[in-house]
Amino acid sequence: MVDMKQRILTGVLAAIVFLFLVIVGKLPFTILIYAMGSVALFELLRMKKLKLVSLPGLIGLLLLWMFLLPSQYSFFEADGISKMEIALFAVLLLLTYTVLVKNTFTFDEVGFITLAAIYIGMCFHYFIEIRNLDQYGLTYIFYACVVIWSTDSGAYFVGKSLGKRKLWPEISPNKTVEGFAGGIVIALVLATIFQLVAQLPIPYIYLLLITLFLSVFGQLGDLVESALKRHYDVKDSGNILPGHGGILDRFDSFLFVMPFLYFLLALFS
């Protein structure tokens, strides 16, 4: 009972802070995303048992911050230097470090830090990019929340009541095929209702297609997080949110959904 109360209290407080800063947008929201991305990166490094306070950890953090940088602040790109060149320079530094420490920091760990910074940095970057879109940026964020949360809830309740066939037992034993499909159906229904209220500038058929893709990719993001935790033998990615785990535990679906939402909006606009 105490754990449930803690879980509810944490969820309510976190949702209030998150939604408030989403509504405010601009610099406060960007700072929130930077903070969340930094914590998420440290959660991944901790899974790998890499030192957080170290030169590789610092390089990984700086690389993450560079990927998170909103488009309007990419001042260095005006000088012909792209994020790709900076990422390459960071990789070269990490590879040099493996030599200096005589392989106590390995090539595999260079790859892990680089991939972690790209995965967390680029995916959270699109949170900022979508919020900074025209007058519908805020509405698109709420739309993504509706799709993800309705998919999660639909998958859980349909899976509990009708689930028989395991979706991927080696990765997430509790997920079922019926729950996976149920999450998509519930997301489509609630996205349709959301469109009736919000009136996004997207034809209904396109909205349904986007919702379908996002619901699927959101569940894939959840499975990827489950696979990571199972591989590194951890229950939760972190404990910054009591009763809910870490940032990765709560935003695994968003990390897959936000880039695809941005690309699909560009495709269908």
From Swiss-Prot:
Keywords: Cell membrane, Lipid biosynthesis, Lipid metabolism, Membrane, Nucleotidyltransferase, Phospholipid biosynthesis, Phospholipid metabolism, Transferase, Transmembrane, Transmembrane helix
Catalytic activity: a 1,2-diacyl-sn-glycero-3-phosphate + CTP + H(+) = a CDP-1,2-diacyl-sn-glycerol + diphosphate
Record GO terms (molecular function): phosphatidate cytidylyltransferase activity
Pfam family, one: CTP_transf_1
Tree of life domain: Bacteria
Subcellular location: Cell membrane
Transmembrane segments: 13-33, 50-70, 81-101, 110-130, 138-158, 180-200, 201-221, 247-267
Membrane topology summary: Multi-pass membrane protein
Pathway per the UniProt entry: Phospholipid metabolism; CDP-diacylglycerol biosynthesis; CDP-diacylglycerol from sn-glycerol 3-phosphate: step 3/3
Disulfide bond sites: none
One GO CC term, this protein: plasma membrane
Enzyme Commission designation: 2.7.7.41
PROSITE patterns: CDS
Any single GO BP term: CDP-diacylglycerol biosynthetic process
Assigned protein family: Belongs to the CDS family.
PANTHER family for the chain: PHOSPHATIDATE CYTIDYLYLTRANSFERASE
Full protein name: Phosphatidate cytidylyltransferase
